Swiss-Prot record:
Organism listed in the record: Dictyostelium discoideum (Social amoeba)
Recorded superkingdom: Eukaryota
Gly residues bias: start-end ranges: 37-48
Low complexity bias: start-end ranges: 21-36
Organism lineage string: Eukaryota, Amoebozoa, Evosea, Eumycetozoa, Dictyostelia
Protein name as annotated: Uncharacterized protein DDB_G0280323
Disordered: annotated segments: 1-48
Length: 48
């Protein structure tokens, strides 16, 4: 899969994920709200 960093709301039809800051090894990915907005205005679109 291609991980594309974005800083704008993801378009419909994409798999939307938001970045959840974590004090562990790496940031975790969590599903974005149903409105499609990415938390903090940053996240990734994962495409096949």
């Amino acid at each position: 899969m291609t991980k594309i960093p974005i800083n704008i709301p993801a378009t419909s039809g994409k798999i939307k994920f938001g970045i959840t800051p974590s004090s562990n090894k790496s940031p975790s990915l969590s599903p974005s709200p149903s409105n499609g907005q990415l938390g903090g205005g940053r996240g990734y679109i994962l495409e096949p």
